[in-house]
Amino acid sequence: MAQWSFAIVADVHVFSSGQVPTSFSTVIARLAALAPRFVVVGGDATVGNPDDGVGADKVRGWWQSFQQALTPLRAAGIPVLAIAGNHDYYTAAHRSEYSAAWPTLDTDFTGVAPLLDGGSPPLSYSFDLDGVHVSLIHAVDQKLEPEVAAWLREDLAAAAGAGLRLVIGHVPLVSMIGHTSETFKNQLGSLLAQGQVAAYFSGHEHLVWEQELTFADGTVRQVHVGTASGTYHYPLNQSTCQAACQGDHGTIPLTGTRFALRPGTRLQADKVNICVVDIDGADFTVRHLCLREDQLVPFGE
């Protein structure tokens, strides 16, 4: 059986000045040494906001800085895929420069696998690799756009013969920091369950968490991958912390992973995190890694 890995890095947020957080540069150097088969940028590489008034030239500069930061991966022969996050996609300038930032995404990936027909990279698209079907979807807020839903439904139906189906989007099905849209959760979650998707990986919330969600047609594992720069992160919501935390420590119930909190807060102590997914045939294992003392080590205690 084929054994390989891929990684997801999300929520880097290049500074408005165009500077890349130094922590992310360190993450990329260490990640290149791990030699995953490919890396997915899980959205929010940039720092756009709805009314920022930033022009295309400045947004282009953000993307140039971000792409430069990925150089160690490409130098190691590790291709990079991407999806948009909300901060990459608010305004016309954000949207146009996001698409322009990934002109050769499909051709860069051909050495690993061809992207399947019918997708629209770098928004929603998919590929098959060694019996694993991976779908990347455009989900930048708690609203499933009809065209994304229609594409995903067809994409997963066509992948019914895959040994394993995984989906990556920016916004999680269930929020661990604030309000969950039940409509979004049920629309997307039901599609994933109907398509027998084993796991849905998301960014957006700048923390590490996992849970199993149940829908009428099955269960889906929800994986929050964290922020790969750690410039800021969010506290777990009060109800989650009451159920899973005691003092300055918490435990992810699904996995049993114990983690530290910043004293007196609901913030996870490990701020800079990435997700590595190990594939073994039709099975997969999720590894959350955090940056400590400039090294990638397992998240938690």
Explain the meaning of each model-derived region:
Residues 4, 37, 124, 131-132, ...:
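Alpha/beta-hydrolase fold active-site loops
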Residues 1-60:
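N-terminal active-site segment of His-dependent metallophosphoesterases
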Residues 6-8, 39-41, 82, 167, ...:
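Residue-level marker for buried hydrophobic side chains located in beta-strands
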Residues 288-297:
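Short, solvent-exposed aromatic-acidic interface loops
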Residues 51-161, 187-199, 207-280:
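Extended active-site neighborhood of metal-dependent phosphoesterases/phosphodiesterases
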Residues 11, 43-44, 85-86, 170, ...:
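Active-site glycine-centered loops adjacent to acidic/histidine catalytic or metal-binding residues
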Residues 46, 159-177:
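Short acidic, glycine-rich surface-loop motifs adjacent to enzyme active sites
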Residues 14, 47, 88, 173, ...:
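Short active-site segment of divalent metal-dependent hydrolases/proteases
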